[in-house]
Every structure is written in structure tokens, then in C-alpha cells.
UniProtKB/Swiss-Prot annotation:
Interacts with UvrB in an incision complex. It comes from Beutenbergia cavernae (strain ATCC BAA-8 / DSM 12333 / CCUG 43141 / JCM 11478 / NBRC 16432 / NCIMB 13614 / HKI 0122). The gene is uvrC. The UvrABC repair system catalyzes the recognition and processing of DNA lesions. UvrC both incises the 5' and 3' sides of the lesion. The N-terminal half is responsible for the 3' incision and the C-terminal half is responsible for the 5' incision. The keyword DNA damage applies. This is UvrABC system protein C. Keywords: Cytoplasm, DNA damage, DNA excision, DNA repair, Excision nuclease, SOS response.
Length: 693
């Protein structure tokens, strides 16, 4: 690991000008490429105190052993050079948007003497027009089959074409009029090229021109009483309309745009793009890539556009512009140098390109659709990855190795605290066994605090939750000692709950908190880890590993360590920790919202013994408000259906003002330690089982 100070340039050596820079490792390989409006300002930021840098940046500057730069004239030139270097050197610390599969395109080989329509994948070839990409090859074949009625362009391979030309007989498509058969001279090479140009124009979105022309031909044939020809043209029109219908009309005719969307977490980014040509979605593609750089959405968009449109720099259409660059590029966020990026795209296209965020109307609605697709793709990717047995096994092995554990963490417990300005504090405990969520083992805690009014902060709350969980585990483990050594008298924990041992004697199932975890994960950094470790130390628990995950998941904190442990971005172990932390956060938030919502809908009538929801509703319907109920006489309340004299007196007694009202916690719900949705436990147990799924 290199020391950045050993290769730090002197401030006076770095020019205060736009440019592109490269970090190299000791072997001379480029590990990172970046651009800057001011090289001096940007490069100086890499050589500040290591602890102030993002962990991923820390890893990059300590991997590198030298830095070099190139000054350019404008920021647009910097953008172009940065893309070229990323493509050339493939640096490991740069975000790379790579398709997870090769998407098929509808291709027309206009570079050949006799153009051919076909399905193509992989690298694009010079002189070939591409339309798409499509999600499936069969979708292209269906489209081509419909279009060949109107544009009977050659679709055969070179070998088939040459054999047909040598024999003087066309292939089957030539006999059924789905090929104009230039191989046997039915149509000249020039006329066939015009046919291929019309095919490309239709696919590029100029469908209205051809539909109007065919409608005129059909009307003319009908006027001449040539009904057979009119019927053929009618069928051609229907075929073209079916092709148009396959591409839903989403925007105004003539709209030429690519619509991008991102869905990201701390480790991965899901990208989706819809290609709109002539107001219709002509193609769609998406992929999920690793988030190897600490970039915001704007910077991610910049990297994305560079890699999507960069290859078009060497592909020029007949007018000198890149045919794959649309007039509009709609993105979810604008990068800092959006003006320069739009200028670069305009240079590629050969005409002005608009780069913007859609704000309203149909384009905004389409952008939301693309974003939904990106979110679903990311969720599907995570689900498939989580369900893979090999990946789970690798994750557990990596955690064992990286954390220095004696054995694989087959049981992982993660704890999170949720609160709103110090109120309704709740803690959650989620359990993963063998890399999978064990929802029947989840637990919820209502944080009490030393005075019963809640903890002062989340570190105190974390200490309380960890203490309560492991105190119960120790009590169950040592039930014989806790019961006086004889085992005949059941032990009780500090809440007065009977402890019968690790196995429930009535059901034969494992008791709550019966199993200790191999690894405890807390949501937070050093303060939360220290609080949890203090709780374990106070209880004498020394055989349970502990780590903390800060909000940025690559920061894995160990007790007593000054710096976090940085796991590789592609690590299955890090991915498992992310899932565990996210699940604990979701579970805590859900419990917190329920508890807060319940307190907001609480009625004074809830305190009346034996008064359920239906009888409360009957009272409120009869009197209109609690104030009027309090002012009523026992006889008036007893007159309400379902009430008697005794119940009426209980209602009035419960509603009578009490000196203790002023000290009652506003909105308090249930007994301490009782989770939402459950009646107050008469045993006062400190957590409740909330099975899910």
C-alpha cells in the first residue's frame, strides 16, 4: 500500500487549467481517470488527510503510486479525452456501465452492394444502420415479417444469395413475395437500395409518410375499380399499422429522444433507457453495474452518457453526424458540466442536442415509467443474487476471513434504532441464518430509557436494546443457576418473565432469544459500535463478534478501531451486510410508523376497562364528543344500547380529571416493552414476536 505523500505533486507544478489526469499503480497500470475544470484544485483534494477521504477514494490513492495529467483547451475537450482514456485503459476504480447481456438490434447493412435486413448482436459495424435495441430477437423477427409485405428487402445470407444468383432461382421468400429477389434480377440493385432506404426511414419514425402514400394508392386503385390491387394495398397498410401499434405512441410525432433513469443503492446502479424515435418507443435496454466510484446522480449520468454515446464518435451517418445520438437526451439529474456535455453530444450528432430533466407532461410521465423499470430491475437483480446458494456460501466465507472469525457467521443479528426527534423510540432485531432472512426470529423493542421516558440518544438506545437481548439469552442459558441451582424453581428475568430454559416446555420449540448469534451488526459508526460493545462487556459476553455499518455500506467498523474495514465493492460478504442492514432499517421504520400512528389516533376512552371499539363508537355516536360524555349523568350513559348502570359509572370514573394527568406521557401507548399491535403483556416481557411472511 503506497503512501500518497510519496508521489504528491507540488502545488506549483499543477496547472490551474482544465484537463484530464491519470493515477497509475506501481506496475504502471492506470487505475483511475478523471477530468477537472481546475487540475490544481481537483488533484490537491486527493492528497488531503486520508481519514477525510471517502473509503473508496482512500483505497484508490493508496493503490496508486504516481499521477500525471494532460492540459486541454476546453472542458469539452476534457470530456472527450476522459472518455478515450477510460475506454483505452479500463481503469479499475472508474464506474463502467456494461450490459449484462448482448441486446439484439434490427440491422440494415447499407454498406453492402445489396443491403440486407437481419438480427445482429455485439459490436456495431461501420456502414450498417441499427434500430433498437430490442429485449428479444423474436420481437425483431415479428416486426421484419410484417414489414417485408411492404418493403421486400433481402434477408438472406451471402451464401444463399450467391447460390440463388448462380442457379437463377430465388429462395422461398422470393416466391411468396416477401423478397424482391435482386439475386435473379427481378429488381435492380439501385431500386433495391431505394427499398432498403424506405425500410430504414420507416423504422426511424417516418411511418406517417408511408401510410399516407399507401392510403392514396388504395384510393386511386378503388377509383379505377382495381379492387384486387386496392385489397393488397389495404393489407399492406394494416401490416404497417400493426408494426406501429407494437411501439406504443408515447410522445408527439417527430419526437426523437433517449430517456434514461437510474435506481441505485450504495453498491450498485441499475440503468434503464428507452429509445424514442418518431414519438414511439423503438428500443429498450437496461443493466446493473457496480458503483465503484463515490459519485452523485449527476456524475453517474455523465459517466453513463460518455459510455453510451462515446462509440458514436467514430460512426458517422450520410450527413456527417452520428445517427445514434438523438435530438433530446432526458436524464434524471444534470451533471455539473451539463453545458459542456450537451456541446459534446451536439458535436457527435452534427446538430444541436438538448440535455435536460423532464419537468411535466408526457415526457415526465415516460421518465417515471423508465425509472420504475430501473427500480424493478435492481430489485430483481438483488433477489436473484440473494437466492443463489453459491453466492451465500461465498458471502459467509468472506465475512469469516475479513472479520477474522473462528467460524462462518451462520446466524447474523442486526440492530437498528428508529425515532422521530427523540419520541416513540423503537429498536429492531432482524435475523439472517445461512445468509437468508429468518423472519420468525425478528424482534421489536420499545426503548424505555433510564427514567422510563426514552433514551437520550440512539447510542443509549442501542446499549439498552443489546443489553435486554443478551440478558435474556444469558438467563435462559443459565436457568439452573438463576433458579437457585436446583432447577425446580423457574428463574425470572428483570421484567418478571419466567425463564424455563432454551426450550419452551409447553411447545417444545426454542424459546425466544435462545440462540446466540455468531455476528452482531449494528446500524451506525464508532459511537453505536462502542455502545453495543459496552453492553456486551457489562454482561460478560465475549464469544460474539460485533461490527457496525455506517450509512455508506463500505464502511465496516470494528470495536476500538480508528479506521473502518473496507471490503471490496464486488464482495459477496459486503452485499450480505447491506441486505441485513437494509432489512433491519425497514423493520425498525415499519414498527416506528405503526407506533407513532397508533399514538396519534388514541382516544381517552381507550383507558376505560372493558370498553371496546364498538361500544366506544356507540358512545361517541350518542354524545358526539368525549367532553359531552364526561358531562353526562350515569342515567344518560346507561340509556345507550349495550350499557348498564355499572358500566356507565366506570366510564365516568375513568373520564374524571386526575392529578396524575399532567404527568402522563402524551401519546403513550401500552405497557413498557410492548410492541404495537399487541395487547399489554401481563408478564411485562420486553419484546414481542412479530412473524412476517
Amino acid at each position: 500500500m503506497a503512501d500518497p505523500t510519496t508521489y504528491r505533486p507540488r502545488p506549483g507544478e499543477i496547472p490551474d487549467a482544465p484537463g484530464v489526469y491519470r493515477f497509475r499503480d506501481p506496475h504502471g497500470r492506470v487505475v483511475y481517470v478523471g477530468k477537472a475544470k481546475s487540475l490544481r484544485s481537483r488533484l490537491s483534494s486527493y492528497f488531503q488527510d486520508l481519514s477525510a477521504l471517502h473509503p473508496r477514494t482512500q483505497q484508490m490513492v493508496t493503490t496508486a503510486s504516481s499521477v500525471e495529467w494532460t492540459v486541454v483547451g476546453t472542458e469539452v475537450e476534457a470530456l472527450q479525452l476522459e472518455y478515450s482514456w477510460i475506454k483505452e485503459f479500463d481503469p479499475r476504480f472508474n464506474v463502467k456501465y456494461r450490459d449484462d447481456k448482448s441486446y439484439p438490434y434490427l440491422a440494415v447493412t447499407m454498406g453492402e452492394e445489396v443491403p440486407r435486413v437481419q438480427v445482429m448482436r455485439g459490436a456495431k459495424r461501420k456502414g450498417t444502420r441499427y434500430f433498437g435495441p430490442y429485449g428479444h430477437a423474436w420481437a425483431i423477427r415479428e416486426t421484419v415479417d410484417l414489414l417485408l409485405r411492404v418493403f421486400p428487402v433481402r434477408t438472406c445470407s451471402s451464401g444463399v444469395y450467391k447460390r440463388a444468383a448462380a442457379s437463377g432461382r430465388p429462395c422461398l421468400l422470393g416466391y411468396i413475395d416477401k423478397c424482391s429477389a435482386p439475386c435473379v434480377g427481378r429488381i435492380s440493385v439501385e431500386d433495391h437500395r431505394d427499398l432498403a432506404e424506405d425500410f430504414c426511414s420507416f423504422m426511424a419514425g417516418e411511418s406517417g409518410v408511408f401510410l399516407r402514400r399507401l392510403e392514396s394508392e388504395m384510393a386511386a386503385a378503388s377509383a379505377e375499380l382495381d379492387f384486387e390491387r386496392a385489397a393488397r394495398v389495404r393489407d399492406d397498410i394494416n401490416a404497417l399499422r400493426r408494426v406501429v401499434e407494437k411501439n406504443a405512441v408515447v410522445l408527439a410525432d417527430g419526437t426523437d429522444a433517449d430517456v434514461f433513469a437510474l435506481a441505485a443503492d450504495e453498491l450498485e446502479v441499475s440503468v434503464q433507457v428507452f429509445h424514442v424515435r418518431g414519438g414511439r418507443v423503438r428500443g429498450q435496454r437496461g443493466w446493473v453495474t457496480e458503483r465503484v466510484e463515490d459519485l452523485d446522480d449527476g456524475a453517474l449520468v455523465e459517466r453513463l452518457l460518455q459510455q453510451v454515446y462515446g462509440p458514436y464518435a467514430t460512426e458517422k451517418g450520410p450527413d456527417g453526424g452520428a445517427t445514434g445520438v438523438p435530438r433530446e437526451v432526458l436524464v434524471p439529474a444534470l451533471p455539473d458540466d451539463a453545458v459542456e456535455l450537451a456541446e459534446w453530444l451536439s458535436t457527435l450528432r452534427g446538430s444541436r442536442v438538448s440535455l435536460r430533466i423532464p419537468q411535466r407532461g408526457e415526457k415526465r410521465a415516460l421518465a417515471e415509467t423508465v425509472r420504475t423499470n430501473a427500480q424493478q430491475a435492481l430489485a430483481l437483480h438483488k433477489t436473484r443474487r440473494a437466492g443463489d446458494l453459491t453466492s451465500r456460501s461465498r458471502a459467509l466465507s468472506e465475512l469469516q476471513e475479513e472479520l477474522g472469525l473462528a467460524e462462518s457467521p451462520l446466524r447474523i443479528e442486526c440492530y437498528d434504532i428508529s425515532t422521530l426527534q427523540g419520541t416513540h423510540q423503537v429498536g429492531s432485531m432482524v435475523v439472517f441464518e445461512d445468509g437468508l432472512a429468518r423472519k420468525s426470529e425478528y424482534r421489536q423493542f420499545v426503548v424505555r430509557g433510564a427514567d422510563g421516558q426514552g433514551a437520550r440518544d440512539d447510542t443509549e438506545a442501542m446499549h439498552e436494546v443489546i443489553t435486554r437481548r443478551f440478558r435474556r439469552y444469558l438467563a435462559q442459558r443459565d436457568v439452573g443457576v438463576a433458579g437457585g441451582g436446583s432447577g425446580e424453581v423457574p428463574a425470572e428475568d428483570d421484567d418478571g418473565v419466567a425463564i424455563a430454559g432454551p426450550v419452551d416446555p409447553e411447545t417444545g420449540r426454542p424459546a425466544r432469544f435462545a440462540y446466540p448469534p455468531n455476528l452482531v451488526v449494528v446500524d451506525g459508526g464508532p459511537p453505536q459500535v462502542a455502545a453495543a460493545q459496552r453492553a456486551l462487556d457489562e454482561l460478560g459476553v465475549s464469544d460474539v463478534a460485533l461490527v457496525g455499518l455506517a450509512k455508506r455500506l463500505e464502511e465496516v467498523w470494528l470495536p476500538g478501531e480508528e479506521y473502518p474495514l473496507v471490503l471490496p465493492r464486488a464482495s459477496e460478504g459486503l452485499y450480505l451486510l447491506q441486505r441485513v442492514r437494509d432489512e433491519a432499517h425497514r423493520f425498525a421504520i415499519t414498527h416506528h410508523r405503526k407506533r407513532r400512528g397508533k399514538s396519534m389516533t388514541r382516544s381517552t376512552l381507550d383507558d376505560v376497562p372493558g370498553l371496546g371499539p364498538s361500544r366506544q363508537a356507540a358512545l361517541l355516536q350518542a354524545f358526539g364528543s368525549v367532553r359531552r360524555i364526561r358531562a353526562a349523568t350515569p342515567e344518560e350513559i346507561a340509556a345507550v344500547p349495550g350499557f348498564g348502570r355499572r358500566t356507565a359509572e366506570q366510564v365516568l370514573a375513568a373520564l374524571a380529571p386526575s392529578p396524575d394527568d399532567a404527568t402522563t406521557e402524551p401519546g403513550a401507548v401500552g405497557e413498557p416493552g410492548t410492541a404495537d399491535g399487541a395487547a399489554a403483556d401481563p408478564d411485562g416481557r420486553d419484546a414481542v414476536v412479530v412473524p412476517e411472511g
